[in-house]
């Protein structure tokens, strides 16, 4: 059975921006986890596309979208029923850099019962799901240093 993780925009941006400080780390991580099934949200894809387009250029954005089309990441649509939980999380973590895309990642993980996230945001270690369980950041700096 393949393991799943919800991916945030940071690793996706790093994957397609060779000048990103985390590019090599993300490429190495994904290369060493070929069975990892990535899923994400439209909010994350929007954020990733916008950053790639402005920071790297249109070709990087196009390459990213083609990768998504080929199954690099499965996009899970969230409807308006997810909004109250996203709003509640944004309010709860108002003192942290927790935005709409981050909330969409946390809510997707919660609703799909996925405990693993792939993010460069260290704050994800503090977030808790509705049952009080932490999300496990499998790309955390602690794991990278312990290798």
Task: Tell me what each language-model feature is.
Residues 1-40, 53-65, 143-146:
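Short, well-structured N-terminal submotif of metal-dependent ribonuclease cores
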Residues 2-4, 111-147:
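Acidic, PIN/NYN-like endoribonuclease modules and their adjacent C-terminal/linker elements
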Residues 75-117, 122:
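Active-site neighborhoods of divalent-metal-dependent phosphate/nucleic-acid chemistry enzymes
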Residues 10-11, 43, 81, 122-123:
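Alpha-helix/helix-capping structural signal
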């Amino acid at each position: 059975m393949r393991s799943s993780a919800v991916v945030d925009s940071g690793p996706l941006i790093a994957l397609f921006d060779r000048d990103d400080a985390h590019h090599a780390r993300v490429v190495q991580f994904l290369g060493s986890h070929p069975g990892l099934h990535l899923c994400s949200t439209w909010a994350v894809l929007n954020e990733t596309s916008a950053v790639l387009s402005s920071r790297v250029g249109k070709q990087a954005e196009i390459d990213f979208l083609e990768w998504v089309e080929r199954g690099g990441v499965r996009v899970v649509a969230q409807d308006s029923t997810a909004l109250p939980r996203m709003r509640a999380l944004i309010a709860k973590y108002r003192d942290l850099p927790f935005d709409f895309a981050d909330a969409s990642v946390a809510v997707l993980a919660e609703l799909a019962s996925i405990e693993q996230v792939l993010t460069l945001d260290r704050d994800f270690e503090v977030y808790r799901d509705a049952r009080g369980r932490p999300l496990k950041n499998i790309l955390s700096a602690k794991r990278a240093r312990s290798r």
